[in-house]
Amino acid sequence: MLRLLLLPLFLFTLSMACMGQTFQYSRGWTNGKRAPPAALVTNGHNLGLLDIYDIQDRPTDIKLERCLLQLQHFVGNALLHRSFANGLAYSASRPDPETDVRSINIHSRPGSGNNNIENSLYPNVNHRQSNELFEALNAPGPDAVEPNDYGKH
C-alpha cells in the first residue's frame, strides 16, 4: 500500500520539478536564453552586448528595405515611392554609424577603418545600393507611375 502511494507522489514531485526548471530558465527568473536582450544587458553588466544587438539589427533593416521597394514596385503607388525616396535621401545625408561599430568589433574587415571608400577592399555596398534605388525611383521612364494611375485599375 505504501509503495502504491509513493509512486504517484514521486511522479508528481518529478513533474513539478521539471515545470519549475522550465519556468525558471525560460521565463526570466535567471535571465535564461529566452530572456529579452534588455534584461541581459541591464543585469549582465556587460556593455559589449549592446554592440552585438545593434549589429544583428542591420541586416534585417536591409532586407526590410528591399521588401518595401518590391512591394512599392508591384503596388505602383506614387505616394509610397515619394516617402521611400525621402527616407533614402535622409539616410544618405547622415554619417555612417557602422564605422563606430566596426572599430569595436573584433571581426571587422580589413580596411574598414579607412574613410576613403575607393581605396577600401570592402566598400560599403549597401549604401551604394540605396543610392541606386533612390535614383531609380526618381527617374522618369516606362515604369514611372502617374498619381492617378492607381485609381484607374
UniProtKB/Swiss-Prot annotation:
GO terms for biological process: acetaldehyde metabolic process; behavioral response to ethanol; cellular response to ethanol; courtship behavior; neuropeptide signaling pathway; positive regulation of heart contraction. InterPro entries: Procorazonin (IPR020190). Keywords: Amidation, Cleavage on pair of basic residues, Neuropeptide, Pyrrolidone carboxylic acid, Secreted, Signal. Expression is restricted to 24 neurons in the larval CNS (8 in the brain and 16 in the ventral nerve cord) and 12-16 neurons in the pars lateralis of the adult brain. Residues 64-153 form a propeptide. Coiled coil: none annotated. It comes from the Eukaryota. One of its GO terms (cellular component) is extracellular region. The modification Pyrrolidone carboxylic acid is found at residue 21. GO terms for molecular function: corazonin receptor binding; neuropeptide hormone activity. The modification Asparagine amide is found at residue 31. Residues 1-20 form the signal peptide. Belongs to the corazonin family. Cardioactive peptide. Corazonin is probably involved in the physiological regulation of the heart beat. Clock (Clk) and cycle (cyc) proteins negatively regulate Crz transcription in a cell-specific manner. This is Pro-corazonin. It comes from Drosophila virilis.
